[in-house]
Amino acid sequence: MRTLDKRIAPNVKLAASLVARAPTLTLAYDARCKSRLAATLDTGEDVAVLLPRGTVLRDGDVLVADDGALVRIAAAPETVLLVRAADPLTLMRAAYHLGNRHTPVEIGDGYLKLEADPVLADMLRRLGTQVDETHAPFQPEAGAYGGGHKHGHDATFAEDYALAQQVFGEHHGHAHSHDHDHDHDHQHGPGCTHGHHGHDHH
């Protein structure tokens, strides 16, 4: 089994013909966050990916196998939320609230894209945005916190729901104090940050 253990720096320009001839490894965002994984090229060949911890692969990246061959990375279509708004301010507000919980977000011309999550979808709709579930490649911003991903309905589900309640003032007339201090037994590279932090919401 061949091992893909080097990524060619994005600023290194390769001959287009070399890249065009390279086999493709198509991966969803979650897999592109992993520095070590067993994968299958689009040709059907099984390979091992062994990259420095914290590496987050992007569509178009080129890896080098231990035999010197090149492999091109492609972002696989996956289930995502496509968020649009009637005005830029509403979309900016949505981006702010997503960034506030370190949710990985792809920012495009007039849209936001994020991993499908029913709680976040509800929050975004209440903020006044149009949210549609679709199937498309997902390439979030690296940003100050690195990439980042979340795990469906585990410990972060409660945090998502608490955030949704807080954002929309569902506790008007009440004095709530939420103290969250979660210890997650997850290990991710710096490019895939959950946002492991305590919240103190008043």
UniProtKB/Swiss-Prot annotation:
Cite a GO CC annotation.
Answer: cytoplasm
**UniProt GO MF annotations:** nickel cation binding; unfolded protein binding
Entries under InterPro entries matching the protein: UreE, UreE_C_dom, UreE_N, UreE_N_sf
> One GO BP annotation here?
urea metabolic process
Start-end of Basic and acidic residues biased regions: 171-188
Which locations, inside or outside the cell, does it occupy? Cytoplasm
Q: Where is this region: Disordered?
A: 171-202
> Could you tell me what this protein does?
Involved in urease metallocenter assembly. Binds nickel. Probably functions as a nickel donor during metallocenter assembly.
Protein name (Swiss-Prot/TrEMBL): Urease accessory protein UreE
Q: Output the lineage of the source organism.
A: Bacteria, Pseudomonadati, Pseudomonadota, Betaproteobacteria, Burkholderiales
